[in-house]
Amino acid sequence: LAITGDPIPTAERDEVKNVYQFNSRKLAQYIVSLAGEGREMPSPLTVFGALNLNARNFDVELRRAQEKLENGMSGFLTQPVLSAQAVENLKKTREALGSRAKILAGIMPVVSQRNAIFMENEVNGIHVDAEIIERFAGLDRAQGEELGLEVSVKAAQAAAPYADGFYLMTPFNRIALMERLIARLK
């Protein structure tokens, strides 16, 4: 997974500096070059990158995705699909890239209103629809997990026509929750 990371938080900018001479496209190009001149990556190795379905200017993100493919990436892992706009941008990506790229849509269950608000406000690249955040109000842990499963299954179903598969992100080490999600997705 060739990624360059998130922007440095404002509070840490005096101590930590951004590195601009390298980006994920150059990293992918370098990784592919390790196979040797004119050779493909040995199977089963492949280079993937990130695709932010929630980018403010998605046309720029889509152009970068095309550049990533030109520099040796085979596909993308998306940010979690938690909004109708993310699904629309996933569709737009599939239409633009066709079968040239594998796309694995991210599925991450939201488990509480606090979790949803944190993801929306503090995690770069994730957008949780306000309607989803509101639905978690007043729910206990069990109810929150059940709603999280429902939202995740609906997100996966909406993303399925445009994705080659999914990758799952486990919230708060809740393995049993993920087992239930996998069972529902089968």
Predicted regions and their residues:
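Catalytic beta/alpha-barrel core
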Residues: L1-A2, S74-A84, E146, Y167-T170
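Active-site pocket-lining/capping segments in soluble small-molecule metabolic enzymes
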Residues: G5-P7, N18-E40, A50-A55, L97-A155, ...
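Flexible, glycine/proline-enriched loop segments at strand-loop-helix junctions
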Residues: A11-F22, S74-Q79
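Short, well-ordered secondary-structure micro-motifs
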Residues: E12-D14, F58-V60, E88-N89, R114-V123, ...
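Short, acidic/polar
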Residues: N57-K68, G148-A158
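Conserved, mostly hydrophobic/aromatic
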Residues: K68, G72, A105, F166
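Non-catalytic positions within long, well-ordered alpha-helices that form the structural scaffold/packing
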Residues: L69-E70, E95, A159-A160
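C-terminal/domain-terminus segments
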Residues: L168-K186
